[in-house]
Amino acid sequence: MNNQPIGVFDSGVGGLSVWREIVRQLPYESILYLADRAHVPYGNRSSREVLAYCDAICGLLIDQGCKAIVVACNTASAVALQALRDLHPSVPILGLEPAVKPAVSLSHTKVVGVMATPATFQGQLFRATVGRCATDVKVVEQVCLGLADWVESGASEEELETLLKGFLTPMLEAKADTIVLGCTHYPFVIDTIRRLAGKDLRVIDPAPAVAAHLAKVLGERGLTAGTKEPGQHRFLSTGDAASFNAACRRLLGLPVQCEEIRWSLGPEGRLSLGQPSPAPHQQKPPQAF
């Protein structure tokens, strides 16, 4: 048994879709969530930049006592997951694998659409997954530039529909009947996707599978929380705390008090993150999301 928190991070608020599912499946676990909003979205960054950011974030989460880390970002998982495991072997580090395998099993037309960032499609993880799981299925790769930004900002619904129609049309014209959400921001617009695409389209959110895998890993390693009290949750952001708090209210109905931390250039030009305050603001989860 281990009552230390789980670390969860993303470039912004997208990883809250994973955080939400972990809270649902593992209500007694505490979570330290970090949003690197100074660099959002990672999909627009180079692989070298993303690895540097993720390395520093994992270091901070481990320093804060996290017993496991979830890379709640498809781009970061595609680019940096194995390197992070090599750099930080003291804790289990989980990432997001594109949910191509379940999509293939569900598709009747044998055409699967994947919505993601360019970096996710270019990553070795995505290529390996497609090569392993989709040998007899057509995979339509749909780059969704601007969609993560919309989720971060909460711009107009009209703008969202314009974006989604442009992304969905090529996949639907290719006869895709199953779509994989390959970015953790996208589950926050899943209802609009379903409304625009029609009730027959299957849309796969990978967050439930990630939370289930986390539960399995914690159990196997004896890291499950030894309490029946609801977990305590803490939120950090490298960007403006007020805008993160507003995004949490908009996306989750959750009134949080986020702490701001700042990036700095350490010895030998190495990126580092300032330590958060020693008196954390911990919050209980809401009754419903």
List the predicted regions and their residue ranges.
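Non-catalytic structural scaffold of enzyme domains
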Residues: M1-F289
